Amino acid sequence: MNDTLKYYEKDPIYKKYIHNQITFSMAYFYSENFILPFSHDEVVHMKGSILNKMFGDYDTKFALVRNLYAYQFAHPGKKLNFMGNEIGSFDEWKEFEPISFSVLDYPKHQGLQRLIRDLNLIYENHSSMYVEEYNPKHFSWILADNGDQSVYAFKRESEEECVIFVFNMTSNFYWDYDLGVPYPGSYEEILNTDKAVYGGWNQYNGLPCLTYGNGIHNQKYKITFKLPSYGAVYLVYNKKQLIDSKKPSLGKNENNTATIL
């Protein structure tokens, strides 16, 4: 995850020049069974805490660290986080001092802790985030080369569902972001790191996103949704929609008896 942290440290103006630091991990991911660690080694010996590594001012650092953890949970592979990362400690780890839980007196830190809790719940309740994660058939990029916008998107699938993960790595806000998706129907937002409960500006998608028009990004269909600054969005598609759409509907003939259409 070293390349990942270096990417998040970078000024967004220059991120398009190091765009592949995020995509490169999937080029070799299936060669071994990887763990994704933000371990103690990243937050000692004058390296700074995870939060302090992030680019920008106070609000931007928190927005980016929320994005970072959403990316870690979305990425295939088992997760590992060192104690204190989940509350957004500003101090790096000191082995002879306790973790600075006093930061939880402040709303931004409370929001980050709540996000980590919800990420764990989402991970537990959505099979596409852990079933067959070392099988390349269950992952594919939707947006891997959009360096100009520094937006990434990929999908992970299980038999029951498909989850779309989208990450905006700059301060640009998109009211109507178009994204290609693989299946027709409704995509429900299950995570938005910009929600106020996480310390964000509450720019989220309250209604399901419905497919329409022609597909883009080498996908058959398209949705439009709100993509906040430095935001990460999870959209889930329940594959039961595919089954229901293939079921014959019942109509009535002239004798008022049911007939299959």
Feature locations, PLM:
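Short glycine-/polar-rich loops that comprise or flank the Walker A/P-loop
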Residues: 32-34, 78-79
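Carbohydrate-interacting/catalytic domains
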Residues: 15-17, 41, 46-47, 58-62, ...
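Flexible, charged surface loops at secondary-structure boundaries
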Residues: 28-30, 158
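Extended, charge-rich helix/loop segments that form flexible
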Residues: 33-43
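Extracellular glycoside hydrolase catalytic/binding regions
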Residues: 1-28, 35-37, 49-60
